[in-house]
């Protein structure tokens, strides 16, 4: 077996990591930064430590704070225009998956013809573009350290998944001190996204020993610490442990790939502007139960990682307990239990089927699915 591991050149972790990053970048003399973020994060004061550190080092920057959830190609073009107008030299993304994915797409345009969605698929970005620093505020998408970006093509109403090592940030930052004020609902959704990353990577056809180790530890940490991070958001230990867990999950899926959960979740996210983590969380137990017959022994290990006492159980019984444990965690952190609660109807499903099957995440799923089977999975998730 041969496989590739692609990671950021530098990763910084722990409270105070933002200040450490600024000192590091100051020595590189990259020039002027475009800070790509969400205006709400600016209003909450979450970027104050970054601004202060940059000002202290007398480092030039321009703020672009127009990012919204589920970013579109139009937003990417707007951000790239801001980058050009301010004569910037590199990018700093601050936020969760949406700001970081937007910055990754802008990075593409700094060295390749647009639009960024033209690079949907695997390995199509020819030139790396300018340096990118990614400061993560959620736990999480792991966008700060992965090769993935997801941008909506508004005309086609589809999430275009761009996967290329050239998108991996040069520096990844996970500073739990800026995660303390993330609302419970966002904490829950992003945490379940991270769990989805870990489980899909572990049962992926691309899994290997290095991704297995990262995925199992990620599952253990997320199952243990997500409820506390949701219920007691200012608990720094819970936030740090979730940051570690989601990063390990990112290390796993960045090499092993994902699966049908993400392939199906991308579609309601695109057409109904639903939170990505919520879509994943709703689909996760349903699709993994569909996958279970093809990976019984692996799901038994997922159950162990989620704290199930599997002693004396057959792998078959333990694998079913893994699905139950996923459902239990999802309910505990307040995830809606079906898409119908979010305005989705049966009529919406037909338009998603072909797009889900064509999604770049689908090929790594341990069990192939037909169009009819995808329809049934969506119906079960209503």
Name each model-derived stretch.
Residues 184-248, 252:
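C-terminal and late-domain segments of enzyme folds
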Residues 140, 247-280, 359-363:
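Glycine-rich phosphate/pyrophosphate-binding beta-alpha loops
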Residues 271-348:
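Gly/Pro-rich interdomain helix-loop hinge
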Residues 42-115, 123, 228-239:
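N-terminal small/polar loop signature for handling phosphorylated ligands or for N-terminal nucleophile
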Residues 1-64, 381:
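An N-terminal, well-structured beta->alpha segment
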Residues 111-207, 298-305:
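A glycine/threonine-rich phosphate-anchoring loop and its flanking beta-alpha core
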Residues 345-382:
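Short, amphipathic C-terminal "tail helix"
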């Amino acid at each position: 077996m041969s496989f590739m591991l692609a990671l950021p050149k530098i990763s910084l972790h722990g409270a105070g990591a933002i200040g450490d990053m600024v000192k590091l970048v100051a020595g590189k003399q990259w020039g002027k930064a475009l800070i790509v973020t969400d205006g709400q994060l600016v209003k909450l004061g979450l970027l104050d430590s970054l601004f202060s550190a940059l000002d202290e080092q007398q480092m030039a920057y321009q703020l672009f704070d127009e990012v919204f959830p589920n970013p579109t190609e139009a937003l990417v073009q707007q951000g790239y225009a801001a980058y050009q107008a301010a004569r910037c030299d590199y990018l700093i993304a601050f936020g969760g998956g949406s700001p970081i994915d937007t910055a990754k797409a802008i990075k593409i345009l700094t060295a390749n013809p647009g639009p960024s969605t033209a690079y949907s698929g695997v390995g199509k970005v020819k030139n790396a573009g300018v340096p990118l620093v990614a400061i993560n505020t959620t736990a999480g998408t792991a966008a700060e350290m992965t090769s993935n970006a997801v941008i909506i093509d508004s005309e086609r109403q589809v999430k275009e998944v761009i996967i290329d090592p050239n998108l991996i940030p040069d520096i990844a930052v996970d500073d739990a001190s800026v995660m303390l004020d993330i609302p419970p609902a966002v904490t829950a959704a992003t945490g379940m996204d991270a769990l989805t990353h870990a489980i899909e990577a572990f049962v992926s056809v691309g899994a290997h020993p290095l991704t297995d180790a990262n995925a199992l530890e990620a599952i253990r940490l997320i199952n243990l610490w997500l409820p506390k991070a949701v219920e007691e958001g200012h608990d720094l230990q819970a936030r740090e442990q979730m940051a570690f867990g989601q990063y390990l999950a990112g290390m796993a899926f960045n090499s092993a790939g994902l699966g049908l959960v993400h392939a199906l979740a991308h579609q309601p996210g695109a057409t109904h502007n639903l939170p990505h983590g919520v879509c994943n969380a709703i689909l996760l137990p349903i699709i993994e139960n569909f996958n279970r017959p093809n990976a019984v022994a692996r799901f038994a290990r997922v159950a162990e990682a989620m704290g199930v006492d599997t002693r004396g159980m057959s792998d078959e019984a333990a694998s079913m307990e893994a699905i139950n444990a996923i459902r239990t965690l999802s309910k505990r952190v307040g995830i809606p239990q079906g898409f119908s609660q979010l305005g989705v109807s049966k009529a919406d499903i037909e338009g998603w089927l072909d797009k889900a099957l064509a999604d770049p995440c689908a090929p790594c799923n341990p069990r192939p699915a037909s169009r009819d089977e995808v329809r049934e999975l969506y119906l079960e998730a209503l």
